[in-house]
Amino acid sequence: VSWGRRAALFAVGILVAAGAAVASIAFSGGGSSSKPVHVEPEVNFALPPASDGCNDVTTVAGGAQQVPLTVSAVAGQVAESVNVCIGGQGPYPFVLDTGAGQSTIDAHLARRLHLAAAGPSSIFAGVGCTGRAQPVSVGSWSLEGIELAPQQLTAASLPQIGGKGEPVGLLGSDVLGRFGAVRIDFAAGTLVVAGAEDPPLSGGTPYTGPVGQLGPPVSLTHGQGTTVPLTVTPSPGAVSLGVAVRFHGGAERNFVVDTGSSQSVAATGVSRDENLHGTNLAQRQATVCSVITVPLVHSGPWSVPRVVLHPQLIGETDFGVISAGGIEGLLGSDQLRRFGWVVLDYPSGVMVLG
């Protein structure tokens, strides 16, 4: 299950809930519909230990701050989570989700913490279901001891969020972007931020990096890695990251850089146009308010600017109305983990792959 694919209507213009308009399995690309379909079982990811408490931050070279990151790899899928404390209570496990433009909290936990409503609730729709989202205000909260600025969160009841042994929220790019640049170190199991929070990214005009001359701080890259341009789209209370992906050297496809997606996904139209070879495998994946089944296809040769990606199985699904915003896929943690670490620099509009 991809924890980060379930808040599509909360994250402005970002799909983090695969299959928001999928009503059935559509096996295309390789004619695999004639074969018996094997549906992979849902997986459970490890969560950060509660024993880490609310203050496990350390200062490292260059003044950067480092916190533990739980990286869990199960059956080819990869997820990362961190401990968040709210109002001195917790810790609570949150998915580290760059694909979530707006951070989200389980509705039951929000009520238990008495988080005040920050506006009217709204209705969202998924596959054969509807739900209600409520903006709430959070004042004092922290990431493993790193103080976070007060802001609004989206409270909602989502599949595989808030139950026993499940995370209780998504820590999104609205928070991560305020640190300027972050290093997600899959190999070391750490999240490193460049320093204290800055104000949110201003303006609502998308920009493509690299912007400026400085780039990511050496305290995060250690002078290594390959720089890849990103398209950053800031909006009030939300941020999205996009990267150009090519299959077989073909046309550029706009993918969201989505650590909350435990498996990478391509839109059905992309899979068809690029003739991605189908399989007889499928996975159960969560949308904003339901769990659906999507086919798996072979990526074949694929790449981002300056970097060849590792061939693998990826999900294929119809993104529905979200595709109207230009989203054609999700570059998930299953692929990003193969590079050992990744640095995301929001102001500069670049990603550095280890």
Give, region by region, the residue ranges found by the protein language model.
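Pepsin/retropepsin-fold aspartyl endopeptidases
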Residues: 2-354
